[in-house]
Regions:
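DUTPase catalytic domain/fold
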Residues: 1-136
Length: 136
């Protein structure tokens, strides 16, 4: 996207990559809003991207992720519903709208490896975007 910045860590010991809002948007009070980031993330099969709200957004602004922690699986990348574009589902706890400017850092992502059980035989195939894992 135009003028989209890749996430970056701000210090050498930061675990999370700061994720910016990809557009100007108003977060409606007491509702969930999907914030577009303009980003996609490719990962190896044994990795996922964990998305968290930035602590300053939660503590100072009353914003929370609607699902507590976003889990972006490796097979979300280039899915047929939305091509794997990352969105952040934010809940505004306040009684007034909250404006987020394009470029504001709203979340952070941490790339994580995971293990599977010895007898794991998952054969499902992602058939779309958010919440759409199934078998083709």
């Amino acid at each position: 996207g135009k003028d989209i910045h890749l996430p970056e860590r701000k210090t050498e010991k930061s675990a999370g990559y700061d994720i910016e809002c990809g557009e100007d948007i108003d977060l409606i009070p007491h509702q969930v809003t999907l914030i577009k980031t303009g980003l996609k993330a490719y990962m190896k099969d044994d990795e996922y991207l964990a998305i968290f709200i930035r602590s300053s957004m939660a503590i100072k602004k009353g914003l929370f992720l609607a699902n507590s922690t976003g889990i972006i699986d490796a097979d979300y990348y280039n899915n047929e519903d939305n091509e794997g574009h990352l969105m952040v589902a934010v809940y505004n706890t306040k009684d007034e709208p909250f404006h987020v400017n394009k470029g504001d850092r709203v979340a952070q992502g941490i790339f994580t490896k995971y293990l599977t059980m010895d007898d794991d035989h998952a054969e499902g195939v992602r058939t779309g975007g958010v919440g759409s894992t199934g078998v083709k």
